[in-house]
């Protein structure tokens, strides 16, 4: 019997709640090693805290590092600047939000969005321990981002979009909240185009970040359909046969004015009124 989208979401939520409780000393880990989002033949390699530079890990609370479940380091490729507003989708224990908050400085803001209460509580404590105050953690779904349109300069995410059961909605929401010309910098698991959906599922489970991964061409087409340009998907490391950690980058199509092009105004209507 096929698993429904809601059932998959609950499996993901339960898995990450368990991981948060383990970091907080309240339960067992997910069984995949140090914070790894792993299953199948991945054995945890290419996931977790080891993907961050030692100097980054050293400046973070231990719990933020231990709670890292990602497959990359999106803050390293997002090219954040002081004063920017950045949003992390599926922010988990807050590692990328804390790093982003320091990059954008006191005049910038870093948002973290997560659906799991246990992860949100852990992230808020980690932010307090890190001494960052320009952060806000929001509860919600990445398919329904609780922020206004055109309110964010940069969206990042770390091994989370593959877990969504409605990736088109996620990409559309990213396009909605980004300002024109805003940037996307994501680490995710991406499949080679040669693999069918069934072959991806053979390599690992949905909650293990494998079965739900998009193929490279699917990711590129999805972003272009959502109004992005300068789309690139670059494989960085193998996590299973035909499956890779990848850096996904794109820019929300700027308005004509932002591109330096003339804005054509509608012609005045003839008549007396």
What are these regions (language model features)?
Residues 30, 36, 41-85, 96-99, ...:
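Conserved alpha-helix/loop element of class I SAM-dependent methyltransferases that forms part
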Residues 66, 71-74, 81-144, 169:
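Class I SAM-dependent methyltransferase SAM/SAH-binding core
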Residues 86, 155-156:
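Hydrophobic beta-strand segment of the Class I
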Residues 144-149, 165:
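Short conserved loop adjoining the S-adenosyl-L-methionine
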Residues 168-183:
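A short glycine-rich, Lys/Arg-flanked "PGG" loop and its adjoining helix->strand segment in the class I
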Residues 191-210:
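Short, glycine-/aromatic-enriched active-site segment of Class I SAM-dependent methyltransferases
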Residues 211-226:
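Short alpha-helix
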Residues 226-229, 235-272:
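Core SAM-dependent methyltransferase catalytic element
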């Amino acid at each position: 019997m096929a698993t429904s989208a809601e059932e998959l979401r609950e499996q993901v939520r339960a898995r990450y709640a368990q991981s948060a409780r383990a970091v907080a000393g309240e339960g067992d880990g997910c069984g995949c090693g140090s914070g790894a989002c792993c299953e199948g033949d991945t054995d945890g390699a290419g996931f977790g805290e080891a993907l961050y530079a030692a100097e980054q890990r050293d400046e973070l609370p231990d719990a933020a590092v231990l709670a890292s479940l990602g497959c990359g380091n999106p803050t390293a490729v997002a090219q954040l600047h002081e004063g920017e507003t950045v949003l992390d989708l599926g922010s988990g224990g807050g590692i990328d939000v804390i790093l982003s908050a320091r990059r954008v400085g006191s005049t910038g803001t870093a948002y973290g969005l997560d659906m799991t209460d246990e992860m949100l509580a852990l992230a808020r404590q980690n932010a307090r321990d890190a001494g960052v105050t320009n952060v806000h953690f929001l509860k919600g779904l990445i398919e329904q981002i609780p922020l206004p349109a055109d309110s964010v300069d940069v969206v990042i995410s770390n091994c989370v979009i593959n877990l969504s059961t409605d990736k088109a909605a996620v990409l559309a929401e990213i396009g909605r909240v980004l300002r024109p010309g805003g940037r996307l910098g994501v680490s995710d698991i991406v499949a080679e185009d040669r693999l069918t959906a069934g072959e991806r599922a053979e390599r690992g489970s949905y909650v293990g970040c494998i079965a739900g991964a998009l193929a490279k061409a699917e990711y590129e087409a999805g972003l272009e359909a959502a109004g992005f340009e300068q789309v690139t998907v670059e494989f960085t490391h193998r996590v299973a046969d035909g499956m890779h950690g990848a850096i996904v980058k794109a820019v929300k199509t700027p308005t004509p004015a932002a591109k330096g092009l003339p804005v054509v105004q509608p012609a005045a209507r003839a008549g007396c009124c």
